[in-house]
Amino acid sequence: MRIDPAEFRARPLRVHALLHDVPLEDVWAGPLAGGGAGRTVQDLRAVMVAGREEAPAVVQGLFRLRSRIGTVFGWDHQRPAWNAESYADRLSPADRARSLVAPGTPDGSFRILYRFEDEQLSELRNATVHAFASLSIRQTPGGYLAYLGVFVQPVHRLTRLYMGAIAPFRRLVVYPAIIRTMQSAWAKRYGGGSAVG
């Protein structure tokens, strides 16, 4: 479900300070039943990757269409100056020491800036947007609650036009499907676990 950004901003996450000047585009959350104690964002990311093939055909079709359009218009070519454009230089030594993976590690179309036990921030830079995906998890009485926050930094004057054009697809189809697929994959792996206190 799409939630009030204020709820997300109230969470004690590193992303709020790191991306203090980047607009927050969307925030979604999904309850995850069971799982037992000690689950982390790494566990959440693992079930999301495992559930990719179960994504609805319409969502897979939209991603394929976006990929083809990006190829035609040259939107998604690797940029040689990625490191210079990355927000990785905003990471403190403490952030780097705490991260479970090295900044710049590929994660699908994104690159991970950091992955803590309860929070991950990934970055995507192409010719249309400079986007960031914040994934976090917290315990609840019945299991866990996962948050997906999307930040977008315009790269030119057409970025907002582009984001506006794809907003209905993102909000009505893509994000709800991501949450449902995540919940389904979580239930398959952890649904039998005991609820968290």
Residue ranges and their predicted role:
Residues 25-29, 119, 145-147:
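Intrinsic-disorder/low-complexity, polar/charged segments enriched in Ser/Thr/Lys/Arg/Asp/Glu/Gln
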Residues 59-62, 152-154, 177-184:
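Short C-terminal domain-edge/linker segments immediately following a structured domain
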Residues 161-193, 197:
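A conserved amphipathic terminal alpha-helix motif
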Residues 126-164:
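Beta-strand/loop substructures that line and gate deep hydrophobic ligand-binding cavities in soluble
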Residues 97-140:
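Hydrophobic-ligand binding "helix-grip"
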Residues 29, 81-115, 193-197:
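Short linear elements at protein peripheries
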Residues 1-94:
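Hydrophobic ligand-binding cavity/cleft-lining segments
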